[in-house]
Amino acid sequence: MSREKILAAVAKNKPDLTPLPEIQNFGNPYANLVEQFKAVLTAIGGEVVYVKDWEEIRAYIQTHFGGRRIVTNIDPLADVAQESWIKSDPHSLEDVGLAILKGQFGVAENGSIWVTETEMGQRVTPFIAETLALVIQKSELVPKMHDAYIRIGGERYGFGAFIAGPSKTADIEQSLVLGAHGPKSMLAFLME
């Protein structure tokens, strides 16, 4: 069969488009979204830090990450970053000790934070840094992934990811390795 015949047969057999099913909202099963988010993220190797404002984040970073290469695209934290990096070659980010990015919202069910390429600066940023810090408002937590999908369903973005905890992998001997495919540690700054 020629290529043209195959393509014509495929085009002729194309099913009608059907709309996506409605996503049902199952409500909030958690008594406290913040505590649920913290419990899950902590259980999977992340850390939650409660802060009131950008100044508290700045102080935390200076205390815990002084001397490391830091990148951020969050304007109120620009003074803790060491250089402009957003338009740099992504390979130049290989030695980043801490990347601080803003997340759009968090999911209490699995301790994840939704981040799009707009917040990432470069797509590689949340995956190449030794430590990833994501900043979200406490009020921006949703209970379940169903709620998260409802929230992102109408958005326009080229790339986005739900990021939950540090990178983890285990081999056949069940030896857990953190940081094999991404950051060794992850912080979530939950801001008032």
Say what each PLM segment does.
Residues M1-E192:
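The feature marks the mature, well-folded catalytic cores of soluble enzymes
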